[in-house]
Amino acid sequence: MQNWETTATTNYEQHNAWYNSMFAANIKQEPGHHLDGNSVASSPRQSPIPSTNHLEQFLKQQQQHQQQPMDTLCAMTPSPSQNDQNSLQHYDANLQQQLLQQQQYQQHFQAAQQQHHHHHHLMGGFNPLTPPGLPNPMQHFYGGNLRPSPQPTPTSASTIAPVAVATGSSEKLQALTPPMDVTPPKSPAKSSQSNIEPEKEHDQMSNSSEDMKYMAESEDDDTNIRMPIYNSHGKMKNYKCKTCGVVAITKVDFWAHTRTHMKPDKILQCPKCPFVTEFKHHLEYHIRKHKNQKPFQCDKCSYTCVNKSMLNSHRKSHSSVYQYRCADCDYATKYCHSFKLHLRKYGHKPGMVLDEDGTPNPSLVIDVYGTRRGPKSKNGGPIASGGSGSGSRKSNVAAVAPQQQQSQPAQPVATSHLSAALQGFPLVQSNSAPPAASPVLPLPASPAKSVASVEQTPSLPSPANLLPPLASLLQQNRNMAFFPYWNLNLQMLAAQQQAAVLAQLSPRMREQLQQQNQQQSDNEEEDQDDEYERKSVDSAMDLSQGTPVKEDEQQQQPQQPLAMNLKVEEEATPLMSSSNASRRKGRVLKLDTLLQLRSEAMTSPEQLKVPSTPMPTASSPIAGRKPMPEEHCSGTSSADESMERPHVRQANTSASSTASSSGNSSNASSNSNGNSSSNSSSNGTTSAVAAPPSGTPAAAGAIYECKYCDIFFKDAVLYTIHMGYHSCDDVFKCNMCGEKCDGPVGLFVHMARNAHS
C-alpha cells in the first residue's frame, strides 16, 4: 500500500489562476466581486471567503443529483496535506462539474434512443442509409433537444492528468474522457440479415406476378410516389426498367421513364396520379388500390389483395411444400422465379418438381433461361400445356373417351386380382370371326396421348383374355380411382415404367424382336394396311377421346384363354433397328396377341374358365376379338395357318410392369413346339404369359421380377406398387418423395421408415 506520508506534496499554487477563472466563468457571483489570481497566489493558505460561500451553495443545489458519485469519489480520493485543503476544494468542484455534464449528456442520449425506438417506422425517423445530398431527417430532433457540448481546454487536461494518477481506474477514465458525442444509433439489423430479408421480399415480389410490381405499396399518395421508400432494414427501394435497365428511386421517375417505352396510342393513365400502363387490368388493379378495394381474401388469414395473382403467391406462405428443389444442393423454394435465379447463378440442375400437395410430377420441367412464368410440361407429357399442379394432372384422368364407355354393352365380368384392385375393370368377350392376320398394337408414347391412334390396328384372330396397358385403362375408364391405400398416381406410374422397362431388355429378347420385326410385313394383309393407313392420315387425333370400338365387336362373346405377349420395339434406334421398322421416333411399347389355339381337350366351358391369375382384361381395341374357327387350324400351307396350329405354348412372365404393360420378358421360355415358334412370333412380339395346358393353374407361371432389386413377385399388385417407388431418372431414388437411396437395401429401408401418402 502506498505511503502517503512519504509522497511529495502536490503544488497547486501555479494553478490557482486557472481555478479562479473557471469559477468566474461558471458560477454566478455578486456584482463588484472579483477574484484576484495574484493575491490568491501570494497567500495560498488564506482561502477567499466569497468564492468558498458560492461554491458551497452550488454544491448544495446539486447534492441531491450527485450524492452517490460524490460519496464514491470522496471515499477513493486520498486526503492531501492540510496546507493544500483550499486548493483541493477547487479541484473537487471542477471534477464534480464535469461529472454533472457527463451525466446530462448521457440522459440526453438515452432520451434520443427512446425517441428513436418509438418513431423508427416513420418516414421522418433516422435512416442510416440516407443517400448523400438528402437532408438528415433527425437533424430537427437533435437540434431542438440537445445542447452543444463544451470542449475541454488543454489546460484542464494537463491539470487533471497528474491528479488522476492517485484515483481509481473508473474515476481516471471519467476524468480523461472528453464529453460524449451524441451520435445516432446504428441500425439494429446486422449486415447478413439486411441482405437476406430484402432478398426474401424480392422473391415474393418477383414470383407472384407481373401485376404485383404496381401493388407493392398500400397507398399512392403524393408523399409515397415522390419520395424514396425505405424498408424496415433501412434499404431504399428502387424500380428497375425491364426494357433498358434504368433504375429509379421514386415512382414518379419510374413512371415517367416507362412512358418513353410505350406507344402513345396505348398509354393508359390513372386519373388520380401519374401512373401509366399499357394493360387494362393493371390500371384496374391500380384504381382498386386508390379506392381501397381488395376483393380477394385469403381463406386462412386476414390477408386481402386486389388481384388473384397476389393471392396465389400469398397462399404459398401457408403451405409447407417446397415445390422446387435443386438436384445438386439442398436448395428448395416455393417460387419458380427464385429457383431459376438459383440455377442460373450456380449452374445447377433442377430436381423433381412437386405438385401443390407434395406429389412428385416428372412431367414438369424447368425452363431455366425462358421467360415463361412457372414450369412447363414435357412434349407429349401427361400434363396439358399451361397446367402445373395436382389439379391439372388429375384432370387428365377425366379427359377420356365417354363414347367408349357408352358403346360398351352390359356383359358378364370375370375379374382377376389386379382387375379387382383396379376397381374391377371388366373383361371383354367376343364370339364373332375376325380377319386372320395378327396385328400390332402400339402403346401411346405417354398416357396423355389418346389411344385413338391405336384404331389403325387390325382385328385380332383369337379370343382375348388380355392384360391391357395402363394407359389404355386410364383413357377408357375415367372413373377409375387410384389405389386407396397407396394413393398412387397410375397415370404418372405408367409414363415412368414405360421408360424404365426400355432400359432392362435382355440381349435374347432383342434378338427375338429383330427376327420378329422382319416378318411383320409378311403377316399383314394389304387391304387392312390400306384401311388403317387411311384412318391414321385422314382422321384427326382427338386427344380427349379414347379409341372407338365397333359395335359388332362389343357383342357378348365366350371367354377363352389368350396368351398375353408383351413386346418392346425400339424403332429408329440402333438397339431395335430393323428393315421393316416404322418411321416413328423413339421407343414404342407394343402388345401382340398371338394366336393361342386351344386343344380339343380344352373345348369344354369348365376348361375355358380362367383360373385366379393377376392378369386382368380390359375393353381395349384388341381385347374383344372373335374366336378363330377350328377348321383353320388344319392348314399348314401359309404363315397364317401355321400360326393357328393347335399347339399350346407355355412361358413365364418376365420382369414387366403389369400396370404399365412393360414388355420386359427376359425370362420368357421358348415355345414348346419348335415348328410354330418362328411363324407365330409375328409383329415383333415375345410371349410373356401363355395359357397353361389342361389341368395346370394359370398363375403358376406368373412371376414378376424387379431387376433393380433382384426380387420376384407372384402378385401383380405388389409388383406394381414396388415398381412405383423406382424413379425413371434414378432407379434408387424414391419416386414418391425424391430422396436418393444407396442401393436396393437403402430404398427398402426408406420405404419402411417413411410414410408416403
Curated annotation (Swiss-Prot):
Comp. bias (Low complexity): 397-414, 512-521, 651-694
Pfam families: zf-C2H2
Biased composition (Polar residues): 39-51
Location in or out of the cell: Nucleus
Gene Ontology BP, a term: regulation of neurogenesis
PROSITE patterns reported in the protein's UniProt record: ZINC_FINGER_C2H2_1 (PS00028), ZINC_FINGER_C2H2_2 (PS50157)
GO molecular function, one term: DNA-binding transcription factor activity, RNA polymerase II-specific
Region feature (Disordered): 30-51, 171-213, 367-416, 511-535, 602-694
Keyword vocabulary terms for this entry: Developmental protein, DNA-binding, Gap protein, Metal-binding, Nucleus, Repeat, Zinc, Zinc-finger
InterPro entries: Znf_C2H2_sf (IPR036236), Znf_C2H2_type (IPR013087)
Entries under Gene3D superfamilies matching the protein: Classic Zinc Finger (3.30.160.60)
Amino acid composition bias (Basic and acidic residues), ranges on this chain: 197-213
Chain positions of all zinc fingers (C2H2-type): 239-261, 268-290, 296-318, 324-348, 704-726, 732-756
Family the entry assigns: Belongs to the hunchback C2H2-type zinc-finger protein family.
Function: Gap class segmentation protein that controls development of head structures.
Protein name: Protein hunchback
Source species of the chain: Drosophila sechellia (Fruit fly)
GN (gene name): hb
